[in-house]
């Protein structure tokens, strides 16, 4: 599952609108829409805040 799909699925699982998720994480609704649309360039600090508000985490793994 890609990041955009995971964020949208978790937000919906929590019964939150994009505006609700934005307010919980301190970002704009436009930012939430951009993440869920898979936009290539988003600010990492804002992304981490959004993920945290949704109970998700960003992980980095070694390539194999």
How should these model regions be labeled?
Residues 5, 15-16, 42:
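Residue-level signal for the short linker/turn that defines the boundary of a DNA-recognition helix
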Residues 12, 23, 52:
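Short polybasic/polar patches that bind polyanions
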Residues 45-61:
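DNA major-groove recognition helix of helix-turn-helix/homeodomain DNA-binding modules
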Residues 8, 19, 48:
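Short glycine-/small-residue-rich flexible loop motifs, especially phosphate/cofactor-binding loops
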Residues 16-30:
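Short alpha-helical DNA-recognition segment
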Residues 7, 21-22, 32-35:
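Conserved hydrophobic/aromatic packing and binding residues within compact polymer-binding modules
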């Amino acid at each position: 599952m890609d990041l955009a799909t995971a964020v949208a699925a978790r937000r919906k699982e929590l019964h939150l609108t994009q505006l609700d998720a934005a307010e919980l994480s301190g970002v704009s609704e436009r930012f939430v829409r951009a993440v869920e649309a898979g936009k290539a360039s988003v600010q990492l600090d804002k992304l981490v805040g959004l993920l945290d508000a949704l109970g998700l985490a960003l992980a980095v793994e070694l390539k194999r």
